[in-house]
């Protein structure tokens, strides 16, 4: 019985010292969102209020536009209209 209590105590202690934050190297946080497809059509400029670029860890680059209604739309960063919207949002 003493052996079981000792082993259980050691397991609890070991679990207490293990931290999920230590399981991955610093700076290796997974991306919060990635795009796997792009919108097929140009968004009306007056619908777009903000944007962000996806992480370089994603399989393909993308610009994510936030609309007035709170939707997020993935767009191809090589498209001319996407670059124009990004520049416009940066200036404002």
Curated annotation (Swiss-Prot):
- Specify the signal sequence span: 1-23
- What task does this protein carry out? Monokine with inflammatory and chemokinetic properties.
The record's account of tissue expression is: Detected in peripheral blood mononuclear cells and lymph nodes.
- What compartments host this protein? Secreted
Q: Show the PANTHER family listed in the entry.
A: C-C MOTIF CHEMOKINE 4-RELATED, SMALL INDUCIBLE CYTOKINE A
Record-level GO BP terms: antimicrobial humoral immune response mediated by antimicrobial peptide; chemokine-mediated signaling pathway; eosinophil chemotaxis; inflammatory response; positive regulation of cell migration
Any one Gene Ontology cellular component term annotated for this protein: extracellular space
Task: Enumerate the SMART domains for this protein.
Answer: SCY (SM00199)
Q: How does it assemble?
A: Homodimer. Interacts with CCR5.
Principal location: secreted
What name has this protein been given in UniProt?
C-C motif chemokine 4
């Amino acid at each position: 019985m003493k052996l079981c209590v000792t082993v259980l105590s050691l397991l609890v202690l070991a679990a207490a010292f293990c931290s999920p934050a230590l399981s991955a190297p610093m700076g290796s946080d997974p991306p919060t969102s990635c795009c796997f497809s792009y919108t097929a059509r140009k968004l009306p400029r007056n619908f777009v209020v903000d944007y962000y670029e996806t992480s370089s860890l994603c399989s393909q680059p993308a610009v994510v536009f936030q609309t007035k209604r709170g939707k997020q739309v993935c767009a191809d960063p090589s498209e001319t209209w996407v670059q124009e919207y990004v520049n416009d949002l940066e200036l404002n």
